[in-house]
């Protein structure tokens, strides 16, 4: 992909942030107010970002949404610049975090699903898998708009034992949260996931590609420290 200049990077980052929070296609007006630039300037920049493969316009009359390439840029950007979420982590402090028993991991997974509003998978071994938070996951806007998401993610959980068996040994080596999206994701091309190893078990945060990666990554780092 062609390298973006500083203004393009800032604009694309803001567009993705807005879309992650709202799930609404982004127009030039919202960005011009946020960046103190004219709507015309923003429109031109967004058109260029679309030509470069970072944005698409789902409908003629709508704004634009990020592509997989945009999310890859976003993930690299937040890791490089150590961008933090605005989540109130005192909400997580009330939970007692332990990793001594299977029940500790299961309880943690349920709490993470509540905090992140996503699904959590815990693989104790290749053949011992627990997951929770499907109702949280399916409450995301993607699943209300497009049945293909419901079908794809339902198939994912139907086949979760086989999928975990295929990735467990490799992903257990991860020392930092590993973020994989779209075509790079072992679960689904419609999926965003963060994988993390804690005390010999593999924890996976699973959501649509439009998931809050900053929040999920910080959450995994926080509970593991």
Spans of features found by a protein language model:
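N-terminal helix-turn-helix
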Residues: 13-17, 21, 25-77
